[in-house]
Design a protein with these regions (language model features):
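Active-site catalytic microenvironments for nucleophilic, acid-base chemistry
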Residues: 21-25, 49-53, 77-81, 98, ...
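P-loop NTPase Walker
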Residues: 1-84, 186
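Conserved helicase NTPase motor core
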Residues: 1-10, 34, 63, 96, ...
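ATP-hydrolysis module of ASCE/P-loop NTPase motor domains
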Residues: 59-62, 80-165
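Short acidic/histidine-centered micro-motifs embedded in hydrophobic/aromatic stretches
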Residues: 70, 120-124, 173-174, 191
């Protein structure tokens, strides 16, 4: 089912109501439903709405995660079942990533980057990863910085040297696991026969692929 409607028209309420219908009327186990939304704040809001509407009839709230929460779940399962822990740490401090971009910009052009420049460059980096672009596509991006391909390559190298990954790398890692380990893909397909996505219009190419 694809629900298209203007902002503020009640799409999320419809999705929460559908979850209640699936659990209370159809008898579907909450463990069989994976519900995804765009932000952590949105997951909490959906859980609150569900409890308000169906708390007495459906005391067990279905799993609601962000796409990065799903990616983390995939990586954790891979670690447990294949005995290979992730050697990389997801960087939660955005300032650390911004500093890497700032330092690289200064090295490449000999100038200090303004906050707006850093923001635009980080948006470009995220866009490349979310749209799964190749090296040949980097020069065509309108980032306002001619040396963006070099900065992008050095940014990823800097993360690898620190054994770090950003949230976009986390999705790439999860997608790679699903593509290369059919048993893990089958596990999640069997575990969650029902998938509900809120704010689907904000889904990027790699998020859709996962």
């Amino acid at each position: 089912v694809l629900l298209l409607a203007v902002p503020g028209s009640g799409k999320t309420t419809v999705l929460v109501t559908r979850l209640g219908y699936m659990l209370c009327c159809c008898g579907i186990s909450p463990d069989a439903i994976l519900t995804m939304t765009y932000t952590k704040a949105a997951t909490k809001e959906m859980q609150k709405r569900f409890v308000r509407l169906f708390g007495q009839d459906c005391p067990q709230v279905p799993e609601i995660r962000t796409i990065n929460g799903v990616s983390s779940k995939i990586i954790d399962f891979y670690t447990r079942t294949h005995g290979s822990g992730s050697a990389f740490t997801v960087v939660e401090n955005e300032g650390e990533l911004a500093k890497i971009v700032s330092d690289l910009y200064r090295e490449l052009c000999g100038e200090f980057a303004t906050q707006s420049v850093i923001k635009e460059l980080r948006k470009g980096i995220a866009y490349v990863k979310n749209m799964m672009l190749g090296k040949e596509d980097l020069g065509e991006l309108d980032t306002g910085f001619d040396q963006f391909p070099d900065l992008y390559a050095q940014y990823n190298l800097a993360l690898r040297q620190r054994r770090w990954m950003d949230y976009d790398d986390q999705m790439i890692y999860a997608k790679t696991i699903l593509e290369n380990y059919p048993d893990i893909l089958a596990h999640f397909q069997d575990a969650f026969p029902y998938i509900c996505v809120d704010e689907a219009q904000d889904t990027s190419k790699i998020q859709h692929a996962i």
